[in-house]
């Protein structure tokens, strides 16, 4: 039972010794390890052995996430994303501009070389303006289906017409004292008695000249006599047969009493 375990252990130990001896033979065979009489020669030989070991041994990830990736690796990693490019800090091209590789590939076509690029002079300004325009477009699109989508100016109050001819003005344009005075004038306007008396005299004179004022513009302005007071009072002609009936009745009664 112990023999197979010892056999495996010896095989592993032999492989390790053979590998170390091969590395040491490579270090000794290099030209840097030829002169080992001085300290500088020994240090150079040690450096050569370290480089050989690092080249053959596997590289484990250490602080690799802190180091910037190369452009080819970035392109390969980001191709499966929808936005397919890095931000400003990571997407520096060969010419130092803050544009992604996708735009660089498009600009490399010979057709675009015929037209001068106006955005090369100020790339930073265009990058800042693009998100603002995009936000405005999104806002306009989202508010189109509402009836208040577009901002409306200040609403105008309807003008109220009063019988005295005074239009209501905005109360905000007057201070408190003027508001009170204006309200008093609207509620109790000042009246000159002399002018009113003269106006009444003129109106009475006009009515005397034209005769009695009747409401001709209404259908009940001058109703016929037979329909006045709801038809209870009939004209004089209709009252004569009734009087004769009364007379006849009285005469008959007197004759009966006399008999």
Swiss-Prot record:
Propeptide: 104-137
Modified residues (Phenylalanine amide): 86
Post-translational modification: Specific enzymatic cleavages at paired basic residues yield the different active peptides.
Positions where Pyrrolidone carboxylic acid occurs in the chain: 26
Cellular compartments annotated: Secreted
GO CC aspect terms: extracellular space; secretory granule
Keywords of this entry: Amidation, Cleavage on pair of basic residues, Endorphin, Glycoprotein, Hormone, Pyrrolidone carboxylic acid, Secreted, Signal
Positions carrying Valine amide: 152
Domain of life: Eukaryota
Signal peptide: 1-25
This protein's record includes keyword Nucleus: no
Family: Belongs to the POMC family.
Protein name: Pro-opiomelanocortin A
Organism (species): Xenopus laevis
Protein's gene: pomc-a
């Amino acid at each position: 039972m112990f023999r197979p375990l010892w056999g495996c252990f010896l095989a592993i130990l032999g492989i390790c010794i053979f590998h170390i001896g091969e590395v040491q033979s490579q270090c000794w065979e290099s030209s840097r390890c030829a002169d080992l009489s001085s300290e500088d020669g020994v240090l150079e030989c040690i450096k050569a052995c370290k480089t050989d070991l690092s080249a053959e041994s596997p590289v484990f990830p250490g602080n690799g996430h802190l180091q910037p990736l190369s452009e080819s690796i970035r392109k390969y990693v980001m191709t499966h994303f929808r936005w397919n490019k890095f931000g400003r800090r990571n997407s520096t091209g060969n010419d130092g501009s803050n544009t992604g590789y996708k735009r660089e590939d498009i600009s490399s076509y010979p057709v675009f070389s015929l037209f001068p690029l106006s955005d090369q002079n100020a790339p930073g300004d265009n990058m800042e303006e693009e998100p603002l325009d995009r936000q405005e477009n999104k806002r306009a699109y989202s508010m189109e289906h509402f009836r208040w989508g577009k901002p409306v100016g200040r609403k105008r109050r309807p003008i109220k017409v009063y019988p005295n001819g005074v239009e209501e003005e905005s109360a905000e344009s007057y201070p408190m004292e003027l508001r009170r005075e204006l309200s008093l004038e609207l509620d109790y306007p000042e009246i000159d008695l002399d002018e009113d008396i003269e106006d009444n005299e003129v109106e009475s004179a006009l009515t005397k000249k034209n005769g009695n004022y009747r409401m001709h513009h209404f259908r009940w302005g001058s109703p016929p006599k037979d329909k006045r007071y709801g038809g209870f009072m009939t004209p004089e002609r209709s009252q004569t047969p009734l009087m004769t009936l009364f007379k006849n009745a009285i005469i008959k009664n007197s004759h009966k009493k006399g008999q």
